[in-house]
Amino acid sequence: MLDILRFVLICGILWILRRVLLRVFIHSPLDKIPGPPPVSFAKGNLPQLYDRNGWDFIKGLGEKYGGVVKINGLYGAKMLFVFDPAALSSVVVKDQYVYERSEDATKSTRLMLGDGLLTSQGETHRKQRKLMNPVFSINHMRDMMPIFYQISRNLRDAIASRIDNGEKEIDVLDWMARTALELVGQAGLGYSFDPLVQDKADAYAEAIKALVPTAFGLRLYRPLLPIALKIGTPAIRRRILKLIPSTRLQRMREISDAIDAHSKRIFEEKKQALARGDEAVLKQVGAGKDILSRLMQANMTASEEDRLPENELLGQMSTFIFAGMDTTSGALAHTLQLLAEHPDVQDKMRAEIVAALGGGQEIPYDTLVDLPYLDAVCRETLRLYAPVTTVNRTAQEDIVLPLSEPIRGTDGNLIQEIPVPKGTEVIVGILASNRNPALWGPDAAEWKPERWLEPLPDTINTARVPGVYSHLMTFLGGGRACIGFKFSQLEMKVVLAVLLSSFKFSLSSKEIVWNVAGIQYPTVGASGKPEMPMKIDRVKNT
């Protein structure tokens, strides 16, 4: 077994050496694209881009170089950082099937999450979305409102029981993460992960929370994955994996195993309930209205051509949990922090919510989604603090990238379009696009919910940013736009409506730092632990 491990290591070194030599000695069309110097040849600019304070680096790219910038990847790789609107349209809409996820990114995600939307490509991806689009429809969102409200009330009661004696400091991120998991569990999978009663979160929730930071720490090894997956059988590869003395790698294996085991158990229970008939389905969590039940029922009646195999249905489960937990919980936590920083906005938003409740417990779907100030606060938070800051795509063939505005090359000439060689990694600058002052104006870096209560700048409307949501790249666009973005919006609005009608949120004395790398998450000061303490008190009736 050790001989196989040495063989894998030698193959990896030779593969890296070959790629390095090709990059050093072969001329690239990207050589004339301006960009910052690398930190080092081995790491390029990636330490700056993925630093916890990476926004300063991203902001500098736009100010100095424009909407398309050449940055340096691992071992001399030439990459493009893109937030020019025309270039974005090409990458995520017009030429979306040329710009796919890289082989190593796809395979590493598949190992963690299975064969879901995040790992499928081409015809398989189109087939999966075709079957899944109806279960994310507005009509289905209406059906899930009782689930959303019940879980949000459970959260409210849990917080209320902890502040009986007055204002108390509570880790808001932890509670938002637990709530997001329970929402995606019940509404997405028809399964309850966490009743929101105990102070300690569910062990499965803890594993999911650790997934992104753990995987992010292994990103430098990802290019070796395609080679490693060609060696032996899965059983042999697993034995080799257990021999590698890496705490982070072994933690990643444990997390992946936990996700897989939990998903299979839920799936089997759901299959058995569907086989027993309607009465058994109604007795399950969610009463058969959850996304997975609807998806499995649709799959059973689909044509042979459109039907998904079980491994792809299982993959959707892991994808729901992964995509729906960290992103939404982070967005909710950030919104509450911003409301604490702007108490006048919090008061105005609370007044709107209380008026809409009219003394009742729930705001109907149509009324809730149309509350103007609540909607403005959510949109502005998702604009300025998009949970996912960048996504990566790789050109599967040679292609030309159009530009809205020309950039000046390193030779002094204006560049109107960029030839992109096959294999080039393109980084979609989600946060950079959302904060682009050329589109949003000089106050683009300010949190101003009121901007959504008046007409947006003409520069926004004419730019045609290809995002599926409000001229923003937060949920991407095209065939790979976030399929659950309406689910996420509804989740945010219901939770905020329930919490703000009962509680007042204030800032902790502790310094909160938002880490930009990958998925944004808060920490206290220089700590690496995701958390966000806030002071919470009951709303005083007047």
Swiss-Prot record:
Heme binds at residue 482. GO terms for molecular function: heme binding; iron ion binding; monooxygenase activity; oxidoreductase activity, acting on paired donors, with incorporation or reduction of molecular oxygen. Pathway: Secondary metabolite biosynthesis. Keywords: Glycoprotein, Heme, Iron, Metal-binding, Monooxygenase, Oxidoreductase, Signal. Its EC number is 1.-.-.-. Pfam families: p450. InterPro entries: Cyt_P450, Cyt_P450_E_grp-I, Cyt_P450_sf, Cytochrome_P450_monoxygenase. Glycans are attached at residues 299, 392. Disulfide bonds: none annotated. Its cofactor is heme. It comes from the Eukaryota. The keyword Flavoprotein does not apply. Residues 1-22 form the signal peptide. Cytochrome P450 monooxygenase that is able to use dehydroabietic acid as a substrate for oxidation. Belongs to the cytochrome P450 family. This is Cytochrome P450 monooxygenase 91. It comes from Postia placenta (strain ATCC 44394 / Madison 698-R) (Brown rot fungus). The gene is CYP091.
